[in-house]
């Protein structure tokens, strides 16, 4: 998530855009004391108490196994990566031809690379994609409610080139996938694509000054340049839970949603779950989006949580047709530049996107907006940033209290960490879903699930039967 990394880098460098902020009039020590007093009395929280709470919650979740806590999706687990969206396997002969550029990946990175190469007049290109078509992660992630978290007018590339404006401020997966494939059509990338093909190796041949790229189709293509655009989200992760291979009910990974079993589609209507006891393991970004749909359809839904996500206001809305008609040439690049400037710590006269991501910067700016003759020290700026983060997270925790009726469930859904310690989420239906009588939060308080059995899941020492 480049915007998240940009923000975090921004924090570590003590806000380059605000480096000229000045402290006025009073000596530094007195102003810092005043700011501390304000944070406890006026902001309504105790920073020391929150720091202690954050440490306590962090320590519950420290693990010694690192990435070993996940299973590799191969062997007995390879079914979790089977593509449910490919109707038939494409048959073709192995390729051994030479091209100028091979692009690995058919998501937005690969599409952008292929399109720009085409615009530059590079005709001999090859795009290799293991999915059934262009779209990258959006080819796989078609779970109910899946949508972009960044404003779609910024997130979707080539909107102007395709004379396209998304239907919603945060558009959903079907439109994103369709737009991906429209890009492929616009720039004639389909004629250069090898779908259902996975790169297995690359070797540089010094003698002929070419890369040889081998694939699972027996290809041995050569190219002067190779562009890696496979992205970080190209393979599911499975939790290494004891007994995961013993469960006798139906299972699938959300990135390979089994609509043949659940019924319905990306918009919901999962009628196949009407008589089913369903378990969702994890409360990250995908769960935040799909839980409301499963909650409306399943007989019973148990949501297993190790660490709660921060869930802020989404406020999605349809695109205003009058606004769309008023857009002038260059609008999308200007909007992208404005967004990237703000979330990377820069300054802009106007916040064009004006959402949860850019609000973070506004919060930080408001906490260090002093005027005068003495500059804020890096330590003082860092302190102000921490207070701004505390303030925002207090709002998010208060939102859980406001939207969830049961006090114990609301408390368990409160995140106690800095905002970017876990990917921030935005959704208006997730928290209220826990008010439904058929929805149950199983909070493991950082421990995670104990075991998966033939019948269901053991968490907190109790077995919960599932279908």
Could you say what each language-model-derived stretch is?
Residues 35-101, 118-245, 249, 260, ...:
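N-terminal FAD-binding dinucleotide-binding subdomain shared by FAD-dependent oxidases/monooxygenases
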Residues 116, 293:
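Active-site signature of alpha/beta-hydrolase-fold catalytic machinery across serine-
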Residues 15, 20-33:
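Short, Lys/Arg-enriched N-terminal segments with co-localized hydrophobic residues
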Residues 105-107, 283-284:
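Glycine-rich Rossmann-fold phosphate-binding loop(s) that bind the pyrophosphate
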Residues 110, 287:
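N-terminal Rossmann-fold NAD(P) dinucleotide-binding loop
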């Amino acid at each position: 998530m480049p915007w998240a990394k940009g923000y975090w880098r921004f924090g570590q460098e003590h806000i380059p855009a605000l480096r000229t902020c000045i402290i006025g009039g009073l000596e530094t020590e007195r102003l810092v004391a005043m700011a501390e007093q304000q944070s406890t009395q006026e902001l309504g929280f105790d920073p020391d108490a929150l720091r202690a709470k954050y440490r306590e919650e962090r320590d519950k979740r420290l693990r010694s196994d690192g990435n070993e806590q996940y299973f590799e999706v191969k062997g007995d687990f390879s079914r979790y990566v089977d593509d449910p969206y490919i109707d038939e396997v494409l048959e073709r002969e192995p390729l051994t031809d030479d091209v100028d550029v091979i692009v690995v990946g058919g998501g937005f990175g690969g599409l952008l690379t292929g399109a720009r190469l085409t615009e530059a007049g590079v005709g001999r290109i090859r795009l290799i994609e293991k999915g059934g078509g262009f779209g990258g992660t959006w080819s796989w992630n078609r779970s109910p409610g899946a949508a972009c978290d960044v404003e779609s007018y910024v997130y979707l590339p080539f909107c102007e080139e395709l004379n396209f404006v998304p239907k919603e401020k945060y558009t959903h997966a079907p439109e994103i996938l369709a737009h991906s494939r429209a890009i492929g059509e616009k720039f004639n990338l389909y004629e250069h694509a090898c779908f259902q093909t996975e790169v297995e190796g690359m070797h540089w041949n010094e003698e002929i000054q070419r890369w040889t790229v081998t694939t699972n189709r027996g290809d041995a293509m050569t190219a002067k340049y190779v562009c890696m655009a496979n992205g970080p989200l190209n393979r599911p992760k499975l939790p290494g839970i004891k007994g995961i291979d013993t469960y006798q009910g139906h299972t699938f990974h959300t990135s390979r949603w089994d609509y043949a079993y659940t019924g319905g589609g990306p918009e919901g209507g999962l009628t196949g779950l009407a008589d089913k006891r369903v378990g969702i393991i994890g409360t990250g970004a995908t769960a935040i989006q799909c839980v409301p749909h499963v909650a409306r359809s399943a007989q019973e839904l148990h949501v297993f949580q190790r660490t709660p996500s921060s869930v802020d206001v989404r406020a999605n809305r349809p695109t205003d047709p009058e606004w769309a008609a008023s857009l002038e040439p260059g609008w999308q690049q200007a909007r992208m530049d404005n967004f990237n400037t703000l979330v990377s710590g820069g300054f802009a006269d106007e916040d064009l996107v004006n959402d949860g991501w850019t609000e973070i910067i506004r919060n930080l700016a408001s906490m260090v907006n002093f005027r005068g003759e003495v500059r804020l020290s890096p330590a003082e700026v860092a302190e102000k940033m921490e207070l701004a983060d505390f303030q925002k997270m207090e709002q998010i925790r208060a939102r859980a209290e406001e939207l969830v009726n049961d006090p114990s469930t609301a408390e368990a859904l409160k995140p106690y960490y800095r905002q970017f310690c876990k990917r921030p989420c935005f959704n208006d239906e997730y928290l209220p879903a826990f008010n439904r009588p058929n929805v149950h939060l199983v909070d493991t308080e950082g421990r995670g699930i104990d075991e998966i059995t033939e019948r269901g899941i053991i968490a907190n020492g109790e077995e919960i039967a599932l279908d």
